[in-house]
Amino acid sequence: MELVLKDAQSALQVSETTFGREFNEALVHQVVVAYAAGARQGTRAQKTRSEVSGGGKKPWRQKGTGRARAGTIRSPIWRGGGVTFAAKPQDHSQKVNRKMYRGAIQSILSELVRQDRLVVVEKFGVDAPKTKELLTKLQALDLKDVLIVTPEVEENLFLAARNLYKVDVRDVTGIDPVSLIAFDKVLMTADAVKQIEEMLA
């Protein structure tokens, strides 16, 4: 199949496997959920009745006071006591094998092509780290909410895009399922497309 280059009167030959496969919604959902779960810190922690300091002495005798019996002032019933089912640090990451991850990326890229959300150009960059220059180039391509993917992150391009809302710059190794679907359009250079094909082959 072919991808038309936006800035040149030519087309780029790409494989059907990477850019023309059927969209697998269940797979994409599973990989995106796993990716988001892996980003969770999972460091929350609360103390149970045995971990709260104090409470070693019985507050009053068992019988004869007229009050409810109590063995410790750190019971979950008491103010300042432990938590009944205390939250503990845990690892939320989910296992996703390489084949599933590749398949999800290929599904997303193929869907981007079908929805005309993937814009391919021969080359893309800025001469100086100037936001105004980058903005002019993006406006020429009618792009506002965009992920820019290049073979390597050029410093000038990265610095120029840093202050732009809804514009991000990644290299080929930095793309992931979440970033590919988070933006309205994805702008790729021809070299980046070739590298992605090799990476997902």
Curated annotation (Swiss-Prot):
**Ranges where the record places region Disordered:** 43-66
Q: Which GO terms describe its molecular function?
A: rRNA binding; structural constituent of ribosome
Does tRNA-binding show up as a keyword for this record? no
For this chain's UniProt record, which GO biological process terms are given?
translation
Q: What's any one GO cellular component for it? A: ribosome
Print the keywords alphabetically.
Answer: Ribonucleoprotein, Ribosomal protein, RNA-binding, rRNA-binding
Cited HAMAP family: Ribosomal_uL4_B
Q: How does it assemble?
A: Part of the 50S ribosomal subunit.
Query: What does the function comment of this entry state?
Result: One of the primary rRNA binding proteins, this protein initially binds near the 5'-end of the 23S rRNA. It is important during the early stages of 50S assembly. It makes multiple contacts with different domains of the 23S rRNA in the assembled 50S subunit and ribosome.
What family, per the record? Belongs to the universal ribosomal protein uL4 family.
PANTHER family referenced in this protein's UniProt entry, alphabetically: 50S RIBOSOMAL PROTEIN L4, LARGE RIBOSOMAL SUBUNIT PROTEIN UL4M
What is the protein named? Large ribosomal subunit protein uL4
Naturally occurring in which organism (per UniProt): Tolumonas auensis (strain DSM 9187 / NBRC 110442 / TA 4)
- Please spell out the taxonomic lineage of the organism that makes this protein: Bacteria, Pseudomonadati, Pseudomonadota, Gammaproteobacteria, Aeromonadales
